[in-house]
Regions:
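Conserved long alpha-helical elements within nucleotide-processing catalytic cores of c-di-GMP signaling
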Residues: 2-17, 21-28, 35-61, 71-75, ...
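Catalytic core regions of nucleotide second-messenger enzymes
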Residues: 71-74, 102-117
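Residue-level recognition of strand-loop junctions within catalytic nucleotide-signaling folds
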Residues: 42, 81-86, 102, 124-125
Length: 163
C-alpha cells in the first residue's frame, strides 16, 4: 500500500468512483484528522507535527488491506480509499482504525502528548464525485471531533444511520 500525493490521491479516487459506478461495487472513504496538529506545530515546530502525521500514517497502514490507498488531502488529514467496502464494512474499518490510533502519543519537551484523532466515514453514492465524497468524510470527522474534543471519535454520514 502506497501513500499518495494529493494529485495522485485525487486521480486514484476518481478511478475508484468510475469503477464503482461501472461495476456496481461499493466504495468508502475514511478521513482521519489530527485535531491538535496545528497546536503541535505552533508549540513544537513543523518537524514534530510532520513526524506525528507520518507516525499516524504508518499505524494506519497496518490496519488496512494492501490495495487500500492513503493520501494527504489537507493539513493534518489522511484520506483512506477503501475500494469494495460498503457502509457497514467502512464502519468496521473506521472503528478498528480509531481504536488503534487513539492510543498514540507523541513526545514533546519530555512529555508524551496524546493526539486528538477523529475519523469520518463517507460511502459513495451514484452522482457523488471525489470532492463531495471527501467533503462528506471531512464533515463526519468534524462532527466526531466535536463529540469528543479531547480524545478520539468516529462518525459517519446520516445515510449510514449514524448521527
Amino acid at each position: 500500500m502506497d501513500s499518495l500525493s494529493a494529485s495522485e490521491l485525487s486521480e486514484r479516487l476518481r478511478e475508484e468512483i468510475n469503477r464503482a459506478g461501472r461495476e456496481g461495487v461499493p466504495l468508502c472513504c475514511l478521513l482521519v484528522t489530527i485535531g491538535n496538529i496545528e497546536e503541535l506545530s505552533r508549540e513544537h515546530g513543523r518537524e514534530l507535527s510532520n513526524r506525528a502525521l507520518a507516525y499516524v500514517a504508518s499505524a494506519l497502514r497496518r490496519q488496512l488491506r494492501d490495495f487500500d490507498r492513503i493520501g494527504r488531502p489537507g493539513e493534518g488529514e489522511l484520506l483512506v480509499v477503501l475500494p469494495g467496502a460498503d457502509g457497514p464494512r467502512g464502519e468496521t474499518v473506521a472503528r478498528r482504525v480509531l481504536d488503534r490510533l487513539r492510543s498514540i502519543k507523541i513526545e514533546a519537551d519530555g512529555k508524551r502528548r496524546p493526539l486528538c484523532i477523529s475519523v469520518g466515514l463517507a460511502a459513495w453514492r451514484e452522482g457523488v464525485d471525489g470532492e463531495e465524497l471527501i467533503a462528506q468524510a471531512r464533515a463526519a470527522a468534524q462532527r466526531a471531533s466535536g463529540e469528543v474534543p479531547s480524545g478520539g471519535a468516529t462518525a459517519s454520514p446520516p445515510a449510514l444511520g449514524r448521527p
